[in-house]
Amino acid sequence: QHPVAGDLKCKLTGRMLMDGGVYLKNDNLFGNGTEFNDLRLGVKATYQNWSMKMEVGYVGNKVSIKDAFAAYTSGKHIIQVGQFYEPFTLDMLCSTYDLRFHQSPGIVLALTNGRRMGTSYTYNGKHYYASGGFFTDSDLGNVKNISQGYAIDGRLVYRPVNEEGKLLHIGAAVVYRTPDSALPGDEDENTFIYKSPGVSTIDNRNLIYAKVDHAKYQLKQGVELMIAHQRFFLQGEYIRTMVKREQNFTNYAGHGGYVQCSWLLTGRQYGYDEALACPGRPVGRALELCGRFNILDMNNEEAGVWGGAQKDFSLGVNYYMNKHIGMKLAYSWVMPGKHIKEISDKNFSVVQLRFQMIL
């Protein structure tokens, strides 16, 4: 961190997540290989009660703007404006560096948006947390020349236990979103799309892909639970979406959830980001054993939408050398369901290794 004139302080930031993966029982001819899952360079600055963050990322052979926002903090109150994640779902708000596995659960990837431009207000108390915001459907990497949809988000968290090494976190969130308009003749007019690549992006086919047209709005709801006690950690969410469609079209619904737990074989305890109300990495040097089960169903017979269904189970071992450097090894067993996309419905597995460094 480099002090500048007056109270202004600046800090360069960086992140590198390098993955390698091998698919086993590979009837779908998945491609093995390596990739940069996340590669970033950015800057953070603070001035009195103000802060700013800007990051540029490289993912999938594409350079894009990640976080780009300013925030004003006064005691327990935070006002934020710019491009950042909407306050919805526990795992999506978590830093990619702090994820227990290589990807967020499939249901989180399918039912959450990326960063969007907007503004939010957050109350961050010791036991009570509330965040709400207004967002457009635009981001700096996808500027649209059409009338953008908008979203109104809200998230509430109750933390009856919130002390060092001990946490009980219970939360709920909701999003109301309207679709984008479209250029004349555009087939994506008034359409919502839900998609997920599953447990890995080494082969980046979308296993889940639900396209819901003739949409008026969508309402997404989620509930979340997090428990931490010294070396033990438990996290779970259930998420549902409902799309209200135009007259003569049946409404659509998709849903799913996950539960994951972990245990520190070495190390003291787990961190917790109170400002975002989301999990952090283990404190100091640590060796972690973790497991996760994820399920999602984006098929809806009444609406005539077949987005696919999937279950998967993952086991992982993570080693955190310090707060900057770590390695992750994970094995995932994937059980495709009805109407899975781009592949057969035969079970398959994948082994992944990650080296990660953050500054």
Where are these regions (language model features)?
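Outer-membrane beta-barrel pore domains
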Residues: 27-28, 186-359
